[in-house]
Amino acid sequence: MMQGTCKISSIEKGALKNLYVVKMDCDNDLKIEFDITKELSIFSKDEEVTFIISREKPEYSEKDFCAHGYLFLERQQEDGSFIDEISLYGLIVKILSKNGLINSKLFKMMDHVYYCVKKKA
């Protein structure tokens, strides 16, 4: 499992109709970008949230965004950092980190995972 605290740095229109891209700056120099549809867009810029990536279904409420899918990509960038991608059945989550989710042995390629972004109480 991986979790942390983030601040939403931007919410931008995506390439497809009714799609937004939420960008977050998180603990430990982690950056996360994820797609969300207009109907599910429940977040605001500068909002503080927590994220969870887990093989087990986490607890969440109707105020949170939670979906499941597969970790399908990890690639190392020229600067040595990693990009991991999770497909939530079409919606994409990109995790930019120093060590990578697979490289650091937290997850394996094609693991079924839950991705949740939870509002602070």
Curated annotation (Swiss-Prot):
Catalytic activity, as annotated: RNA(n) + a ribonucleoside 5'-triphosphate = RNA(n+1) + diphosphate
MF term (GO), any: DNA-directed RNA polymerase activity
Pfam family, one: RNA_pol_RpbG
Keywords carried by this UniProt record: Cytoplasm, DNA-directed RNA polymerase, Nucleotidyltransferase, Phosphoprotein, Transcription, Transferase
Keyword Transferase set for record: yes
A GO term from the CC aspect: DNA-directed RNA polymerase complex
Post-translational modification: This subunit is phosphorylated.
Localization annotation: Cytoplasm
Record InterPro entries: NA-bd_OB-fold, RNA_pol_Rpo8
Keyword Membrane set for record: no
Enzyme Commission code: 2.7.7.6
GO biological process: DNA-templated transcription
Chain ranges passing through the membrane: none
NCBIfam families referenced in this protein's UniProt entry, alphabetically: PRK14980.1 (NF011549)
Subunit details: Part of the 13-subunit RNA polymerase complex.
Family: Belongs to the archaeal Rpo8 RNA polymerase subunit family.
Function of the molecule: DNA-dependent RNA polymerase (RNAP) catalyzes the transcription of DNA into RNA using the four ribonucleoside triphosphates as substrates.
Annotated protein name in UniProt: DNA-directed RNA polymerase subunit Rpo8
Gene encoding the protein: rpo8
